[in-house]
Curated annotation (Swiss-Prot):
Record protein name field: Carboxypeptidase N catalytic chain
Location of the Peptidase M14 domain: 24-338
Family: Belongs to the peptidase M14 family.
Catalytic activity line of the entry: Release of a C-terminal basic amino acid, preferentially lysine
Subunit structure: Tetramer of two catalytic chains and two glycosylated inactive chains.
Glycosylation site residues: 400, 402, 409
Signal peptide: 1-23
GO CC terms: extracellular space
Amino acid sequence: MPDLPSAFLPLLLLSKFVTPVTFRHHRYDDLVRTLYKVHNQCPDITRLYNIGRSVKGRYLYVLEFSDYPGTHEPLEPEVKYVGNMHGNEVLGRELLLQLSEFLCEEFRNRNQRILRLIQDTRIHILPSMNPDGYEVAAAQGPNTSGYLVGRNNANGVDLNRNFPDLNTYFYYNSKYGGPNHHLPLPDNWKSQVEPETRAVIQWIRSLNFVLSANMHGGAVVANYPYDKSLEHRFRSPHRTSNSPTPDDELFQTLAKVYSYAHGWMHQGWNCGDYFPDGITNGASWYSLSKGMQDFNYLHTNCFEITLELSCNKFPRQEELQREWLGNREALIQFLEQVHQGIKGMVLDENYNNLTGAVISVTGINHDVTSGEHGDYFRLLLPGTYSVTAKASGYEPKTVTVTVGPAGPTLVDFQLKRSTTQVHPVQKAPGRGQGSRAKQPRTSRKKDQAAKRHRGPA
């Protein structure tokens, strides 16, 4: 076993009963068999579903982990991992298969940390967003020649340059006024993107994701938004300008969580390049347009970072175990970050759930909205904040909230109908695309957690 920092020892000790896994590259059929194997081993906490097909008809499979798979539980956050967006960048794909087996085995072994994670979180794992590109790259195998072979999808399109460009609209709105969140898509967006991109967009619109990471290769660094430079400068021998989001401090913290839990990312010097703390603003490294992490932030409630995980885009099979051991703790710690900040229900005077209510934090020019079940999640660093909830036809309500370092603060909002507006209220429907609705659990565990972290109503 490679030498690893002492911080890895607790998780390694908890993992002594894990069934040995094979560290090898998985072609498409093998990937599907592996996902089904994990699902069959842990049917009570997993669901295997697909979000669409690739250009060549391969399914984009997602493995979900939850104590109620297929169900959104109000106040339980949704988090996702996406791998293999570029077909020739394969480490993320293999890490996510390893992570899936690890979560299943550790749950069966009653690892308390993993039990708590799966009981309190709905986790979605998409190992390969670009299975067609992967098959092209895998036919070549680990080889430094043909560096970009298989990067694009079967239509020759780079999927990380294929999302609707919402940055331009946001930069304009920031200067002249306009929405700072959930920017609308053009009417013809479906005809402008590839099948894989369309599938992912429909997926992230159907579930209220809170946190995400997108895995790449060719460097070792945690990259956070924005990817597109305000100055519209693109990759050159010199770094472009930093383009921070309104949540820049939070994004830097999320990136550092992964970097410092990783075996060597935090050291900075990797792959012949240097990134302080092992993190970088995307545009500060090089500017790209129509990327996925910026799209998540500007169109949904989801905060996504991009993880560059290996110097070699297609590492040799013999390197996979070392890479897994170097990333395992970071993968778990990043998932746990979804449980910070504030969350709660937005209700009307009759205790009906309100969907689409806007949650604003004074001093941070980026809002989130309540989901279809009336619950909202707002990632925040520890501190004291002024938070406002507002919905059409209702009087806004503002409270002062203190966020601590251990777990989210629960803050519910009950809004009174406005006496000056007569707009109809939009109530949360009972069911949403891709999942069943479930009433909030009243278990002692969640009641006690709510009491510990409840903020002002």
